[in-house]
């Protein structure tokens, strides 16, 4: 299942791409570029236009009170899930989880993640198994790590994998390794025909 990462600034462009691709997309992920460029209202507009759930990829990483202050406004704006960094500690994670559903970053897809994040993977998995978030982030660029995380993660916690497409990850490989969702951005929103690009990835996952 595909999560469309709309890492663009322009509201009109984001809404157009979302409408064009909604038949092949399970959820939409909004990150800082779109929120800064278009405001928090873009969350509700995307939901109203597509009927899809929205992930707010804020990667919250602050003290509990600040995390809670941010999260409250984002959930009120219509976000279904907020992505949170676990390295700031259980109390900061739980401050967000008390307000709504969260997704924890266990590993990231870029090379730099190997330096500081990956050494803490097992601790992040342990925290995820305790707080039972909706899901965790694992790297679609490294299917073997997706498999490692899946084998240790509590049943029912979803795995979402960024890094598909532009970063080199393959959608089908990530799903076969244990991912529930593949997060795809540039390969769809920068494509000449975003709908066709989304359909091709959808068909790849389905083996068609």
From Swiss-Prot:
GO terms for cellular component: cytosol. The keyword Lyase applies. It is an enzyme of class 4 (lyase). Pfam families: OMPdecase. The active site is at residue 59. GO terms for molecular function: orotidine-5'-phosphate decarboxylase activity. GO terms for biological process: 'de novo' pyrimidine nucleobase biosynthetic process; 'de novo' UMP biosynthetic process. Its EC number is 4.1.1.23. Keywords: Decarboxylase, Lyase, Pyrimidine biosynthesis. Pathway: Pyrimidine metabolism; UMP biosynthesis via de novo pathway; UMP from orotate: step 2/2. The keyword tRNA-binding does not apply. Substrate binds at residues 7, 29, 57-66, 109, 162-172, 185-186. It catalyses: orotidine 5'-phosphate + H(+) = UMP + CO2. Gene3D superfamilies: Aldolase class I (3.20.20.70). Catalyzes the decarboxylation of orotidine 5'-monophosphate (OMP) to uridine 5'-monophosphate (UMP). PANTHER family: OROTIDINE 5'-PHOSPHATE DECARBOXYLASE. Belongs to the OMP decarboxylase family. Type 1 subfamily. Homodimer. This is Orotidine 5'-phosphate decarboxylase. The gene is pyrF.
């Amino acid at each position: 299942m595909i999560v469309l990462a709309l890492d663009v600034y322009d509201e009109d462009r984001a809404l157009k791409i979302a409408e064009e691709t909604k038949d092949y997309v399970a959820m939409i992920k909004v990150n800082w570029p779109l929120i800064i460029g278009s405001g928090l209202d873009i969350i509700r507009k995307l939901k109203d236009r597509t009927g899809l759930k929205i992930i707010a990829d804020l990667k919250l990483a602050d003290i509990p009170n600040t995390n809670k202050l941010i999260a409250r406004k984002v959930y009120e704006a219509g976000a279904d899930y907020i992505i949170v960094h676990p390295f700031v500690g259980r109390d900061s994670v739980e401050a967000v989880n008390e307000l709504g559903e969260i997704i924890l970053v266990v590993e990231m897809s870029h090379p730099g993640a190997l330096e500081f994040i990956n050494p803490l993977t097992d601790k992040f998995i342990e925290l995820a198994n305790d707080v039972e978030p909706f899901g965790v982030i694992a790297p679609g660029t490294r299917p073997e790590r997706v498999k490692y995380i899946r084998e240790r993660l509590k049943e029912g916690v979803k795995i979402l994998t960024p890094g598909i497409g532009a970063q080199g990850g393959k959608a089908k490989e990530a799903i076969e390794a244990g991912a529930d969702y593949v997060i795809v951005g540039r390969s769809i929103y920068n494509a000449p025909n975003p709908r066709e690009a989304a359909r091709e990835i959808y068909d790849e996952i389905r083996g068609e």
